[in-house]
Each structure stands twice: as structure tokens, then as C-alpha cells.
């Protein structure tokens, strides 16, 4: 029996559910297991634990922002193929969200207290990008993923040598972020102008500075 198309109410409720899962810790079902080679939790000093927790909180916030961005773009995208691509990428990024939440819990820490704000701002940006054009929307994704990859690689370099667990998680995330970037470009993503790229980087830096502590 064929499934009936989703009504506007169904779509609204589904969107609300996705938003809540993005901002409420541990609300997503188990997805792929942690991409780690050992179940052993590395021993870190108090200072090291706090620093790694700050880095993972930034990365968790980045994944919350990715959820908001993809959901916003899917909400306003004009092309059905673009909508499906945004939704698929968002679903894959849920794994990253869960991995960061898990590592934060292992470190005895928590996500950013501003998580709902990060999501809301990103949803708005994504919705605007999706409304402008498909090429701009996909270009926005490509640039976002490129900048996310940069800070993931920077964080990997800042990890204590013995924290192989966090390193493997971030390395897997980085590989998949770059894949999402290539996918966006392959589907027609346009290069963004330098002022837009610089503004995105400035906003990301403000987010990282805040999320590291809060």
C-alpha cells in the first residue's frame, strides 16, 4: 500500500521533532557506533579534560549549527532534489552530534548552554540561503563544511597525545564534512564572495569563543 503524502501539519510536526532532537542532548536514537579503535577511555589531567571538553563543546555546537542550517535550507529550498540532499546530509550529521555528546559525557561535561540560540540562528541563515537560490544555498553549505573542516583539523592538533579517542572521532567527522562539501559543489554549489566568507568566519569565531566556555 502506497504511503500518503505528508500534510502541512505532518511536515510541521516533523520539523519540530527534528529541531528538538538537535537541541535536547541524548534525544537522538543510537546511530553508528563511535568511530574509535578501542573502548578504553584515556586518562587525562584535570586541565587536559577541561580543554578537550571545551573543544568537543565547540564541535557539538558546530553540529547543532549544521542541523539548523540544513533544516532551514530544506524548509525554503526551491528544488526537491536539493531538499532531499539537505535532509540526507542532516541525517548523516546526526551521527556527529551523538558522537560529540557521548564524548562530552565521558569527560564529565555538557553541551553549550546556548544550544537553542545556535540552532535558531543557523536555521534562519539556512532558510535565507535556501530562499535566495539553489546555487547559493549549496555554495553556503560547501563553504560552511570547508570552515568546519579547518577547525576540526585545528582541534585534532590541540588534543593531548594520549587522547586517541577524541582524535579518531574528529578525524572521522572531518572526512565526512569534506564529503558533504564535495557533494554540495557537485550539485551546483556556487563560490561565495569574499565578504560573505569573511562574515561567516567572523560569526564562527564568535561562536567558538563562547561555546568553549559556555
Curated annotation (Swiss-Prot):
Keyword terms: Cell membrane, Iron, Membrane, Metal-binding, Monooxygenase, Oxidoreductase, Ubiquinone biosynthesis
Subcellular location field: Cell membrane
InterPro entries named among the record's database cross-references: COQ7_proteobact, Ferritin-like, Ferritin-like_SF, Ubq_synth_Coq7
One term under GO cellular component: plasma membrane
Binding site for Fe cation 2: 93, 145, 177, 180
Keyword flag Metal-binding: yes
Listed GO MF terms: 3-demethoxyubiquinol 3-hydroxylase activity; metal ion binding
One biological process term in Gene Ontology: ubiquinone biosynthetic process
EC code: 1.14.99.60
Binding site for Fe cation 1: 63, 93, 96, 177
Leading EC class: oxidoreductase
Xref: CDD domains: DMQH
Reactions accelerated catalytically: a 5-methoxy-2-methyl-3-(all-trans-polyprenyl)benzene-1,4-diol + AH2 + O2 = a 3-demethylubiquinol + A + H2O
Pathway: Cofactor biosynthesis; ubiquinone biosynthesis
Manner of cofactor binding, per the entry note: Binds 2 iron ions per subunit.
Stored NCBIfam families: DMQ_monoox_COQ7
Biological role stated in the UniProt entry: Catalyzes the hydroxylation of 2-nonaprenyl-3-methyl-6-methoxy-1,4-benzoquinol during ubiquinone biosynthesis.
Family: Belongs to the COQ7 family.
Descriptive protein name: 3-demethoxyubiquinol 3-hydroxylase
Amino acid at each position: 500500500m502506497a504511503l500518503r503524502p505528508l500534510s502541512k501539519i505532518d511536515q510541521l510536526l516533523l520539523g519540530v521533532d527534528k529541531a528538538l532532537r538537535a537541541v535536547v542532548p541524548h534525544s537522538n536514537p543510537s546511530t553508528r557506533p563511535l568511530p574509535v579503535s578501542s573502548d578504553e577511555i584515556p586518562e587525562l589531567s584535570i586541565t587536559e579534560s577541561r580543554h578537550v571538553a571545551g573543544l568537543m563543546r565547540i564541535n557539538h555546537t558546530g553540529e547543532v549549527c549544521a542541523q539548523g542550517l540544513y533544516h532551514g535550507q530544506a524548509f525554503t529550498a526551491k528544488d526537491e532534489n536539493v531538499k532531499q540532499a539537505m535532509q540526507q546530509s542532516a541525517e548523516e550529521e546526526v551521527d556527529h552530534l551523538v558522537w560529540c555528546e557521548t564524548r562530552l559525557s565521558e569527560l564529565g561535561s555538557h553541551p553549550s548552554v546556548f544550544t537553542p540560540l545556535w540552532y535558531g540562528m543557523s536555521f534562519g541563515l539556512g532558510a535565507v540561503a535556501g530562499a535566495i537560490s539553489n546555487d547559493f544555498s549549496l555554495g553556503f553549505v560547501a563553504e560552511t563544511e570547508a570552515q568546519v573542516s579547518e577547525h576540526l583539523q585545528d582541534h585534532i592538533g590541540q588534543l593531548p597525545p594520549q587522547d586517541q579517542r577524541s582524535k579518531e572521532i574528529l578525524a572521522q567527522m572531518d572526512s565526512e564534512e569534506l564529503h558533504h562539501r564535495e557533494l554540495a559543489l557537485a550539485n551546483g554549489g556556487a563560490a561565495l564572495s569574499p565578504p560573505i566568507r569573511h562574515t561567516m568566519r567572523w560569526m564562527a569565531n564568535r561562536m567558538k569563543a563562547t561555546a568553549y566556555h559556555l
